[in-house]
């Protein structure tokens, strides 16, 4: 699909434009129009061109530019002068340059893999004429394509390529170095110029990618950002690749490139039921042997994964932090991750030379973690790291790199999950039962707190009453204190008066007694004597009277007779009074009768 109808060679804006096969002799040049981002330059010289501003690559003699594209397919050639460029692309596949420079801001997902063979008997016509043979890959965004960056149901990719190593310079803003492949295959070996690069950003059910079985060089990279049920990727035994070391901005790297045995490295970001991907890595001072690595970001029931990666880090840029090469195996969310064996991870990271004294060097790490998992087993990690030379000048030899130098750590196994192998209904029932129990406990605690609150309120009332009584007692105590102070002041005044009287009596004692005082004293004596005598006379008179009364009481019956007669006289007087009353009543009755008759 293109928004520029007309010439097919110049597409201003394209989504998933397929590659145009180029088959031109060496020295033929085709002009290309420039676009807004990523101008394609035509160079006829044999030197390596410099990087473009926004991911532009220089083409030598033969170019098929796509100025602004999403997922332009790869163009593969056997000639060193045939190249294609994808200035600005999302998920662009391989662009093969033997001496291609890196763009300024770094291409997105592009991997160089120029193919050349050493078979003299089977490649005579191609080497004699110098023609460039291209095998374009599929579009970047496609459904069911063979080579794509975003596809559904990608078929298997079987590659057998041989690529010489190409020196490359580091980009300005942290693009990783391009990776080329070389081979030391004998002349009689089978040859193929088809690149094996499959970048799947979003894939459903991508089958396995199989490498070659011969000793030919193989470079297979399968990157899948989102996959459902992606099978394992099996690397070819005996494949041989060469990784071009990354150089700094101003310095060059004259050391020998590390020869590595590289298989496939599929990486998935989101997977359901992904099978195991096995890998093994060995870091030495001159070579690195690496097989596949697999990582998932979100998985349900992911099986075991054994990962080994060999990722050279990107060189330090001028304005950004040095690249960090990580290989993560993270089943972020997993239910029932059963029978997962121990994961062995080995990482060989090559840090770029530092740009300045305060810049942080590149870090290589391969971690296996679980964000949300039930019953994840233990994970074993093995890491080996080698470092490059300084920023400016040639890279010195690293004497510390020793084969087999690894550091392993074994974390403790997490406790088993209590809800593993349980259905959702069982979990909900358990939670409901726990909620009911906790509710009952909470209600009991609420009742207890209510009782405590009621007790506190009652005690508060008692404390208020006690405080009132205390205030009253303090007021009464203050009044008593005032009274005591008044009494003490009165007592002080009385003491003063007594002191004055005592002083006056002392003055009176000194005076002489007169004759009147003597007479008074005598009169007081006589009066006392008279009073005592009168008392004795009164006692004597009482005794005489008592004796006279005793003698004046004779024993005769006359007094008794007088008493009886007096009683009878009183009775007769009462009877007489009653007679008078009856007579008066009869008289009144008679008067009434007489009044009635007359």
Curated annotation (Swiss-Prot):
Segments for region (Disordered): 1-140, 154-420
Record's GO cellular component terms: nuclear envelope; nuclear membrane; nuclear periphery; nuclear pore; nuclear pore central transport channel; nuclear pore nuclear basket
Residue ranges with Low complexity bias: 24-86, 123-140, 154-169, 176-197, 208-229, 279-302, 337-357, 379-388
InterPro entries xref list: NSP1/NUP62, Nucleoporin_NSP1_C
GO molecular function: phospholipid binding; structural constituent of nuclear pore
Keyword field contains Membrane: yes
Disruption phenotype: Abnormal spore germination; spores fail to divide with defective septum.
Location in or out of the cell: Nucleus, Nuclear pore complex; Nucleus membrane
Modified-residue entries (Phosphoserine), positions: 489-490
Stored SUPFAM superfamilies: Phase 1 flagellin
Keywords: Membrane, mRNA transport, Nuclear pore complex, Nucleus, Phosphoprotein, Protein transport, Translocation, Transport
GO BP of this protein: mRNA transport; protein import into nucleus; ribosomal subunit export from nucleus; RNA export from nucleus
Pfam family, one: Nsp1_C
Membrane topology value: Peripheral membrane protein
Biased composition (Polar residues): 1-13, 87-99, 232-270, 311-336
Protein task: Functions as a component of the nuclear pore complex (NPC). NPC components, collectively referred to as nucleoporins (NUPs), can play the role of both NPC structural components and of docking or interaction partners for transiently associated nuclear transport factors. Active directional transport is assured by both, a Phe-Gly (FG) repeat affinity gradient for these transport factors across the NPC and a transport cofactor concentration gradient across the nuclear envelope.
Domain notes: Contains X-F-X-F-G repeats.
Similarity remark: Belongs to the nucleoporin NSP1/NUP62 family.
Record's subunit section: Component of the nuclear pore complex (NPC). NPC constitutes the exclusive means of nucleocytoplasmic transport. NPCs allow the passive diffusion of ions and small molecules and the active, nuclear transport receptor-mediated bidirectional transport of macromolecules such as proteins, RNAs, ribonucleoparticles (RNPs), and ribosomal subunits across the nuclear envelope. Due to its 8-fold rotational symmetry, all subunits are present with 8 copies or multiples thereof.
Name of the featured protein: Nucleoporin nsp1
Source lineage: Eukaryota, Fungi, Dikarya, Ascomycota, Taphrinomycotina
């Amino acid at each position: 699909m293109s928004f520029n109808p007309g010439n097919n060679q110049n597409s201003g804006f394209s989504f998933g434009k397929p590659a145009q096969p180029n088959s031109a002799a060496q020295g033929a040049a085709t002009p290309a129009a420039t676009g807004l981002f990523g101008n394609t330059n035509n160079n006829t010289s044999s030197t390596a061109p410099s990087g473009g501003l926004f991911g532009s690559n220089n083409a030598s003699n033969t170019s098929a530019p796509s100025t602004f594209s999403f997922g332009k397919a790869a163009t593969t050639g056997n000639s060193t002068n045939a190249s294609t460029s994808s200035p600005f692309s999302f998920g662009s596949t391989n662009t093969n340059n033997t001496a291609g420079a890196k763009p300024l801001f770094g291409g997105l997902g592009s991997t160089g893999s120029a193919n050349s063979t050493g078979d003299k008997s089977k490649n005579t016509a191609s080497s004699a004429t110098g023609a460039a043979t291209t095998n374009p890959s599929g579009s970047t965004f496609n459904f069911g394509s063979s080579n794509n960056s975003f596809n559904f149901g990608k078929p298997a990719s079987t590659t057998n390529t041989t690529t010489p190593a190409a020196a490359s310079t580091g980009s300005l803003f942290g693009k990783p170095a391009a990776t080329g492949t070389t081979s030391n295959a004998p002349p009689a070996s089978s040859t193929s110029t088809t690149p094996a690069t499959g970048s799947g950003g979003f894939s459903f059910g991508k089958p396995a990618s199989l490498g070659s079985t011969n000793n030919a060089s193989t470079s297979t990279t399968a990157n899948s950002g989102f996959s459902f049920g992606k099978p394992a990727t099996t690397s070819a035994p005996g494949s041989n690749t060469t990784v071009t070391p990354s150089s700094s901005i101003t310095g060059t790297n004259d050391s020998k490139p590390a020869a590595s045995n590289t298989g496939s490295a599929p990486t998935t970001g989101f997977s359901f039921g992904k099978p195991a991907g096995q890998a093994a890595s060995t870091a030495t001072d001159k070579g690195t042997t690496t097989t596949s690595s697999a990582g998932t970001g979100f998985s349900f029931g992911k099986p075991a994964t054994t990962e080994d990666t060999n990722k050279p880090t990107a060189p330090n840029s001028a304005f950004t932090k040095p690249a960090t090469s990580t290989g993560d195996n993270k089943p972020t969310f997993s239910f029932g991750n059963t029978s997962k064996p121990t994961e062995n991870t080995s990482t060989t990271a090559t840090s770029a030379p530092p740009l300045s004294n305060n810049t942080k060097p590149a870090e290589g790490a391969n971690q296996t973690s679980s964000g949300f998992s039930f019953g994840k087993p233990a994970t074993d990690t093995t890491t080996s790291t080698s470092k490059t030379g300084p920023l400016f000048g040639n890279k010195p030899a690293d004497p510390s790199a020793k084969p087999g130098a690894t550091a392993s750590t074994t974390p403790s196994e997490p406790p088993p999950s209590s809800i593993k192998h349980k259905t959702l209904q069982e979990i909900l029932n358990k939670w409901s039962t726990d909620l009911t129990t906790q509710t009952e406990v909470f209600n009991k605690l609420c009742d207890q707190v209510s009782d405590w609150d009621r007790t506190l309120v009652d005690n508060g009332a008692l404390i208020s009453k006690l405080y009132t009584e205390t205030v009253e007692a303090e007021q009464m105590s203050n009044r008593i204190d005032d009274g005591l102070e008044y009494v003490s002041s009165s007592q002080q005044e009385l003491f003063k008066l007594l002191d004055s009287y005592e002083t006056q009596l002392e003055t009176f004692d000194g005076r002489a007694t007169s004759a009147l005082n003597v007479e008074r004293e005598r009169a007081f004596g006589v009066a006392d004597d008279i009073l005592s005598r009168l008392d004795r006379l009164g006692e004597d008179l009482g005794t005489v009277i008592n004796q006279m009364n005793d003698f004046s009481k004779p024993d005769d019956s006359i007094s008794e007779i007088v008493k009886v007669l007096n009683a009878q006289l009183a009775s007769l007087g009462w009877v007489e009074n009653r007679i008078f009353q009856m007579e008066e009543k009869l008289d009144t009755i008679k008067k009434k009768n007489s009044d009635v008759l007359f």
